């Protein structure tokens, strides 16, 4: 699955444990992961952690990121404030696939309290390996840029 060499992972306090599992999973797949999230479960402000990933992607230091919070909603709002970011809150394989194929998403957002842990790695794999289809989808993306 070596679609991306670098994946950025960030989280707030609610996503710390899931982020740790995700990083281990990605590293086992020989992906380089930069962790710019919290390192414990003490309360932090999610916009600060979303901004870290957004800034790194905008600077082109990494092509793709993963953000994790309790539901993912706040992270989605915070990350999508930039026109260069297409952050997608995904709950299953279909949303992960469409996020990439139709929307060229560059940040996957997961809700630690809402995601089915049995399929979280499948969702990540689908997100990382699906290619943007372009065509009519590109026309639509240009309208919201």
From Swiss-Prot:
Organism superkingdom: Bacteria
Organism of provenance: Rickettsia felis (strain ATCC VR-1525 / URRWXCal2) (Rickettsia azadi)
NCBIfam families: PRK05571.1, rpiB, rpiB_lacA_lacB
Keywords tagged on the record: Isomerase
Catalytic residues of the enzyme: 102
EC class name: isomerase
Taxonomic classification: Bacteria, Pseudomonadati, Pseudomonadota, Alphaproteobacteria, Rickettsiales
Pfam family, one: LacAB_rpiB
Key word Ribosomal protein present: no
Biological-process GO terms, alphabetical: carbohydrate metabolic process
Signal peptide (from-to): none
SUPFAM superfamilies (UniProt xref): Ribose/Galactose isomerase RpiB/AlsB
Residues engaged in binding substrate: 13, 136
EC number: 5.3.1.-
Name of the protein this chain belongs to: Putative sugar phosphate isomerase RF_0486
Any one GO molecular-function label of the UniProt entry: intramolecular oxidoreductase activity, interconverting aldoses and ketoses
Family, as annotated: Belongs to the LacAB/RpiB family.
InterPro entries: RpiB, RpiB_LacA_LacB, RpiB_LacA_LacB_sf
């Amino acid at each position: 699955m070596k679609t991306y060499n670098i994946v950025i992972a960030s989280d707030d306090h609610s996503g710390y444990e899931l982020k740790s599992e995700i990083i281990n999973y990605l590293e086992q797949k020989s992906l380089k992961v930069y962790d710019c999230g919290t390192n414990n479960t003490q309360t932090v402000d999610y916009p600060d952690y979303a901004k870290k990933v957004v800034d790194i992607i905008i600077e082109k230091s990494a092509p793709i990121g993963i953000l994790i919070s309790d539901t993912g909603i706040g992270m989605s709002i915070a990350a999508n404030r930039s026109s260069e970011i297409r952050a997608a809150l995904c709950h299953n394989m279909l949303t992960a696939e469409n996020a990439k194929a139709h929307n060229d998403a560059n940040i996957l957002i997961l809700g630690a309290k809402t995601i089915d842990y049995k399929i979280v790695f499948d969702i990540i794999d689908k997100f990382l390996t699906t290619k943007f289809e372009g065509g009519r989808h590109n026309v639509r993306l240009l309208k919201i840029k």
